[in-house]
């Protein structure tokens, strides 16, 4: 299973319609688009998927739709993290029922939980996942939970934990984790340092911008396998030019707008309180969509 979890995993967006409801047809198209661009798997229901502005029922519905489109074709990881252990367990059970390959959970946030409470939270989710491997999700910039290296080392050795999504930007820590846990599946979480993360020991990555240019990230992986660091850096630079624009527009709404211009997503809106993309960026996003479609073809 560890080998199946390695690779380039798109952190899947969740399309909504003009009434702010789940757009299931756009979601299906997006899943098929990602499969078509050659990614290894999907990370469903995470930060990029706007999970924390959805109800549990909606999150389960997303898992069900994605499984219908992609089960058995690519690796599927269900992010089931919430502040509530019971709700995370419910989502983990759903992931097992729908045939996902693994579950993942961000550290419980908002309240100042003790580290042992974090460990108990993960143990409970692992139990409810009924044999599915756990991917611990470390994203201190958004969760507010700043784990020490010793705490990370403890979490990744809990029974049932197979992988870590490391979204911290600390490449030294990435290398330290790899050195301490050679068999752990380690994901780079920040797209803008993907190549550097691989060189620091990551097995692959989970990222938002893979939704629109996953083939570029696969190209980085292949270049490094062939020892062509210069090519990997050139591809990373091309990815980062896109990321520069998306940071200005707002990453999730910018991605949805590009996918709208690619005829994948019908409505390029995130769920409120996220605002729409500022109209001044629309020409640049449309040009980007055209460039990527030509490159992919």
From Swiss-Prot:
Disulfide bonds, paired cysteine numbers: none
Keywords on record: Carbohydrate metabolism, Cytoplasm, Lyase, Schiff base
Functional pathway: Amino-sugar metabolism; N-acetylneuraminate degradation; D-fructose 6-phosphate from N-acetylneuraminate: step 1/5
Active site: 137 (proton donor), 165 (schiff-base intermediate with substrate)
Keyword Cytoplasm belongs to the record: yes
Residues where aceneuramate binds: 47-48, 167, 189, 191-192, 208
Entry GO terms, CC: cytosol
Catalysed conversion reaction: aceneuramate = aldehydo-N-acetyl-D-mannosamine + pyruvate
EC number: 4.1.3.3
Tree of life domain: Bacteria
SMART domains named in the record: DHDPS
Any single Pfam family the record assigns to this protein: DHDPS
GO aspect biological process, one term: N-acetylneuraminate catabolic process
Family note: Belongs to the DapA family. NanA subfamily.
Cited function: Catalyzes the reversible aldol cleavage of N-acetylneuraminic acid (sialic acid; Neu5Ac) to form pyruvate and N-acetylmannosamine (ManNAc) via a Schiff base intermediate.
Protein name, UniProt field: N-acetylneuraminate lyase
Name of the gene: nanA
């Amino acid at each position: 299973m560890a080998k199946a979890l390695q690779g380039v995993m798109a952190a899947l967006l969740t399309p909504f319609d003009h009434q702010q409801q789940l757009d299931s047809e756009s979601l299906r198209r997006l899943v098929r688009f990602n499969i078509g661009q050659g990614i290894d798997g999907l990370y469903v229901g995470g930060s990029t998927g706007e999970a924390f502005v959805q109800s549990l029922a909606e999150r389960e519905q997303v898992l069900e739709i994605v499984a219908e489109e992609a089960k058995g074709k690519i690796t599927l990881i269900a992010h089931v993290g919430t502040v509530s252990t019971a709700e995370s367990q419910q989502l983990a059970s759903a992931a097992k029922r729908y045939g996902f390959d693994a579950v993942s959970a961000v550290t419980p946030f908002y309240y100042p939980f003790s580290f042992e409470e974090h460990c108990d939270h993960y143990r409970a989710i692992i139990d409810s996942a009924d044999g599915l491997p756990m991917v611990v999700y470390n994203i201190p910039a958004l969760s507010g939970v700043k784990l020490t290296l010793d705490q990370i080392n403890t979490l990744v050795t809990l029974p049932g934990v197979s992988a870590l999504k490391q979204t911290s930007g600390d490449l030294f820590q990435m290398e330290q984790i790899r050195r301490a846990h050679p068999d752990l599946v380690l994901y780079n979480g920040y797209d803008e340092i993907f190549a550097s993360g691989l060189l620091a020991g990551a097995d692959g990555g989970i990222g938002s911008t893979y939704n629109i240019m996953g083939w570029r990230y696969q190209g980085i992986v292949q270049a490094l396998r062939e020892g062509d660091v210069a090519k990997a850096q050139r591809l990373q630079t091309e990815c980062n030019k896109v990321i520069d624009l998306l940071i200005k527009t707002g990453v999730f709404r910018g991605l949805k707008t590009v996918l709208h211009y690619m005829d994948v997503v019908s409505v390029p809106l995130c769920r409120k309180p996220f605002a729409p993309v500022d109209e001044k960026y629309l020409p640049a996003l449309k040009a980007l969509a055209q460039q990527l479609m030509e490159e992919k073809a």
